[in-house]
Swiss-Prot record:
Cofactor: pyridoxal 5'-phosphate
A Pfam cross-reference name: PALP
Family to which the UniProt record says this protein belongs: Belongs to the serine/threonine dehydratase family. DsdA subfamily.
Domain of life: Bacteria
Protein name: D-serine dehydratase
Residues with the N6-(pyridoxal phosphate)lysine modification: 118
Length: 442
């Protein structure tokens, strides 16, 4: 971006200067509305989420047999919700900032099949596509036991079709593993940030991995192009897919059930704050949408991004969405948080969700490494750097009197609050790699 344009952008949005300087930044969204007001802009409804829920239930018998690690849960792909009191104390000590309320961790990092939040959306979209093809071919009815999809006849049928996706790693992992198991031919277009072990794991499942020297945006674009030339190839579009988004959104009702099981209350007197790591935006956007439908105006969602890849904060704050990238303002999009290394946010997610998000913040790679180490020491839970992005959120909220006043939170409401950190990945990181992460923490 030329200097004059840049200066006028900074004049209009002074916060951009902090982003350019790679400062850890917090922006509380003044445009937040009620659910009733914000919902029409999403373009999806509660019924759409119920349909996704029903589809996953139809596939449960299949998943239980195809992936034995899901059998105990009856073929439902869901993660644990745990309290992390020792980590809460550690954060208070390190930052000299009390955290009012209770700190919890949602362990999507340990979801079965692919060990990340992408096991929600990625697997769901592959299943939705497989179901559509099988129904259209007259091989399946909605009343069938879907475990019949494991038969050689279905494998043969699906092998005529292929799936393509562009990814920094975790989405490719979930879509690759699921597609290969069903019988699709699958190609994952991986950006320069993708970890070697993720590529190796995909190849071990018979997935074709195409590697790029450039970032995520290029991998997605090339994947899209390759798919266009083949009528039997289905491209899963991380930037614009409503199906992916709905796969993530099912998490809202599931979390509500987990809260009920644990006797946790969410209402006006007991607010819920949720901190979601954000790359292109589909995962956190879909989850936040589901949470809003489940908990209404009593849940407050925040997106967390690396200082080197603040694409969603930049897009929503300036109102330019996918018309601006972090590279346009001179930021390099290079971060250890490979899952979040995205320079241009999803325009669909930004426009759909901007009224339903309470805020956005950035944190440095070093901060993620530090918290990764503390969590391993205090709670014995090991995550990848991206998954720690949400861990800084409770601090930012508890330290901001202006945010608390904007929403009229009393001291008592904050004492009764639940702070939920959404851990997005790390359950499948090889030990050697994990030890390298741990060595970087202070």
């Amino acid at each position: 971006m030329e200097n004059a344009k840049m200066n006028s952008l900074i004049a209009q949005y002074p916060l951009v200067e902090d982003l350019v300087a790679l400062k850890e930044t917090t922006w509380f969204n003044p445009g937040t509305t009620s659910l009733a007001e914000g919902l029409p802009y999403v373009g999806l409804t509660e019924q759409d989420v119920q349909d996704a829920h029903a589809r996953l239930s139809r596939f449960a018998p299949y998943l239980a047999k195809a992936f034995p690690e899901t059998a105990a849960a009856g073929g439902i792909i869901e993660s644990e919700l745990v309290a992390i009191p020792a980590m809460q104390k550690r954060l208070e000590k390190e930052y000299q900032q009390p955290i009012a309320g209770q700190l919890l961790l949602k362990k999507d990092s340990h979801l079965p099949i692919s060990g990340s939040i992408k096991a929600r959306g990625g697997i769901y979209e592959v299943l939705a596509h497989a179901e559509k093809l099988a129904l259209e071919a007259g091989l399946l009815t909605l009343e069938d036991d879907y475990s019949k999809l494991l038969s050689p006849e279905f494998k043969q049928f699906f092998s005529q079709y292929s799936i393509a996706v562009g990814s920094t790693g975790n989405l490719g992992l979930s879509i690759g593993i699921m597609s290969a198991r069903i019988g699709f031919k699958v190609t994952v277009h991986m950006s320069a940030d993708a970890r070697a072990w993720k590529k190796a794991k995909l190849r071990s499942h018979g997935v074709t991995v195409v590697e790029y020297e450039q970032d995520y945006g290029v991998a997605v674009e090339e994947g899209r192009k390759a798919a266009q030339s083949d009528p039997n190839c289905f491209f899963i579009d991380d930037e614009n897919s409503r199906t992916l988004f709905l796969g993530y959104s099912v998490a809202g009702q599931r979390l509500k059930a987990q809260f009920a099981q644990q006797g946790r209350i969410v209402d006006a007197d007991n607010p819920l704050f949720v901190y979601l790591p954000c790359g292109v935006g589909g995962g956190p956007g879909g989850v936040a949408f589901g949470l809003k439908l489940a908990f209404g105006d009593h849940v407050h969602c925040f997106f967390a991004e690396p200082t080197h890849s603040p694409c969603m904060l930049l897009g929503v704050h300036t109102g330019l969405h996918d018309q601006i990238s972090v590279q346009d303002i001179g930021i390099d999009n290079l971060t250890a948080a490979d899952g979040l290394a995205v320079g241009r946010a999803s325009g669909f997610v930004g426009r759909a969700m901007e009224r339903l998000l309470d805020g956005f913040y950035t944190l440095s790679d070093q901060t993620m490494y530090d918290m990764l180490g503390w969590l391993a020491q205090e709670e014995g839970i090991r995550l990848e750097p991206s998954a720690l992005a949400g861990m800084a959120g409770s601090q930012r909220v508890c330290a901001s009197v202006s945010y608390q006043q904007m929403h009229g939170f009393s001291a008592e409401q904050l004492r009764n609050a639940t702070h939920l950190v959404w851990a997005t990945g790390g359950g499948m990181v090889p030990e050697e790699e994990m030890n390298q992460y741990l060595a970087k923490g202070r």
